[in-house]
């Protein structure tokens, strides 16, 4: 199963990183400055459950190709419109879209964009920050 995480910040970086660490086929869709930083320093997770430094698969909006089985949205709600445009090339006819975002209003927007049967309900509870 191919999984695309939009965002590698506190939330997406943690859940996507842990999924990759467990052997899942995870790719992060990030902006170029974040991609450069991850390439240089790795994706670092510091947690009471164990620290990790990963070199995950990365794409930018310019290099994104092909569809994924699942696209996980881990952006802020105010970035939803640009997030939808960024992931559109990765959403094929059988792709599921899983938002793990703040708020619930995004479900109506995602249902209109990608069909309700493909938009999954997502909930996560985590205290995470993006650090140096």
Where in the sequence are the language-model features?
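Rossmann-like NAD(P)(H) cofactor-binding subdomain of soluble oxidoreductases
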Residues: 52-132
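NAD(P)+-binding Rossmann beta1-loop-alpha1 motif at the extreme N-terminus of oxidoreductases
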Residues: 1-43
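Short, electropositive, low-hydrophobicity segments enriched in small/polar residues
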Residues: 11-21, 46, 54, 107, ...
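Conserved N-terminal Rossmann-fold NAD(P) cofactor-binding segment
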Residues: 25-68
């Amino acid at each position: 199963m191919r999984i695309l995480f939009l965002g590698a910040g506190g939330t997406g970086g943690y859940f996507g990183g842990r999924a990759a660490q467990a052997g899942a086929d995870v790719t992060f869709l990030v902006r170029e400055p974040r991609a450069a930083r991850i390439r240089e320093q790795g994706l670092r997770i510091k947690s009471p459950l164990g620290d990790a430094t990963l070199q995950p698969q990365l794409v930018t909006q310019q290099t994104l190709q092909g569809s994924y089985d699942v696209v996980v949205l881990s952006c802020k709600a105010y970035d939803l419109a640009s997030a939808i445009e960024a992931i559109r090339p990765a959403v094929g006819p059988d792709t599921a879209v899983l938002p793990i975002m703040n708020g619930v209003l995004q479900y109506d927007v995602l249902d209109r964009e990608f069909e309700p049967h493909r938009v999954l309900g997502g909930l996560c509870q985590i205290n995470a920050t993006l650090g140096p």
